[in-house]
Curated annotation (Swiss-Prot):
Disruption phenotype: No visible phenotype under normal growth conditions, but mutant plants show enhanced resistance to salt stress. It comes from Arabidopsis thaliana (Mouse-ear cress). Keywords: Nucleus, Stress response. Interacts (via N-terminus) with WRKY8. It is found in: Nucleus. One of its GO terms (biological process) is negative regulation of DNA-binding transcription factor activity. GO terms for cellular component: nucleus. This is VQ motif-containing protein 9. It comes from the Eukaryota.
Length: 311
């Protein structure tokens, strides 16, 4: 029973929709036919009735002329003016019309720049600021060299040039820059003593170079060696054979230093309580100085030591 009721309801709905669709189709068809009739009347020759209808339609379609004239006048009033401007003057004309400040700046005289005062530095920066540097002036090297070279070396140079030895002046070391006067009082005794040692070593090195320029074969002999030979008793000379005479090349070099005492080497100076005299380079280079451990160079001529002469 339910199935038969549902089928009957569906069939009635389908029939209703079919009738509504057919009704819509008929109305659409009628409307289409009416439009075709209207168009066919326009294509056909106009009759009196059709001419009156067409004139009425034209009058309704055309706008009235007065409002059109008013609109044209309003358009002419709102149109901007047209300028014929040269391309070179375009910028100036635009600036004049727009009233830009760039044009006013060009025409107006230039204003002087305003210098703002610099902000003052704080007192803390002034307190932390270091003192200004002291300008250090180096002393001329000529004065320093004259002070370091002893006076006796000038006389020796004159005597040796007469004999025929040409000595080249030794190149001095570069002097240290002096300390600024501000820190002169703060110098420690250790630094002053080190400076004294440095100056003494420099003087000894310069004298050693000057003495070594005489003859590279013969060593230096101290005057104390000659004094011991002169003061020795004749019995000692008779008991021991006399030493061999040195070659003639060393005779010239030995006679010259007798007038000037040889400077003591650094570290070889004798103490006041020591019974021994000053040590000379000939003692260091003698063959009997085996305890010192210095080797004898083959180019030097060996000389007897005072110990050998005394025994």
């Amino acid at each position: 029973m339910d199935k038969s009721c549902n089928s009957s309801g569906d069939s009635s709905a389908v029939s209703a929709s079919a009738t509504s669709s057919t009704g819509n189709n008929t109305t659409n068809r009628d409307h289409y036919l009416r439009q075709l009739n209207k168009l066919s009347h326009k294509i056909s020759k106009p009759t009196n009735s059709s001419s009156s209808v067409s004139v009425a339609n034209r009058e309704i379609d055309l706008p009235p002329p007065p409002p059109l004239q008013i609109n044209q006048g309003n358009l002419h009033q709102h149109q901007p003016p047209v300028y014929n401007i040269n391309k070179n003057d375009f910028r100036d004309v635009v600036q004049k019309l727009t009233g830009s400040p760039a044009h006013e700046r060009i025409s107006a005289p230039p204003q002087q720049p305003i210098h703002h005062p610099k902000p003052q530095q704080s007192s803390r920066l002034h307190r932390i600021r270091p003192p200004p540097l002291v300008h250090v002036i180096n002393r001329p090297p000529g004065l320093l060299n004259d002070a370091l070279i002893p006076q006796g070396s000038h006389h020796m140079n004159q005597n040796w040039t007469g004999v025929g030895f040409n000595l080249r002046p030794t190149a001095p070391l570069s002097p240290l820059p002096p300390l600024p006067p501000v820190h002169a009082a703060a110098e420690s005794p250790v630094s002053s003593y080190m400076r004294y040692l440095q100056n003494s070593m420099f003087a000894i090195d310069s004298n050693r170079k000057e003495f070594s320029g005489l003859s590279p074969l013969a060593p230096l002999v101290s005057p104390r060696w000659y004094q011991q030979q002169e003061n020795a008793p004749p019995s000692q000379h008779n008991s021991f054979p006399p030493p061999h005479p040195p070659p003639p090349s060393s005779a010239v070099s030995q006679t010259v230093p007798t007038s000037i005492p040889a400077p003591p080497l650094f570290g070889c100076s004798s103490s006041p309580k020591s019974p021994y005299g000053l040590l000379s380079p000939s003692i260091l280079l003698s063959p009997s100085s085996g305890q010192l451990g210095f080797p004898v160079s083959p180019t030097t001529v060996p000389l007897p030591s005072p110990k050998y002469k005394g025994h």
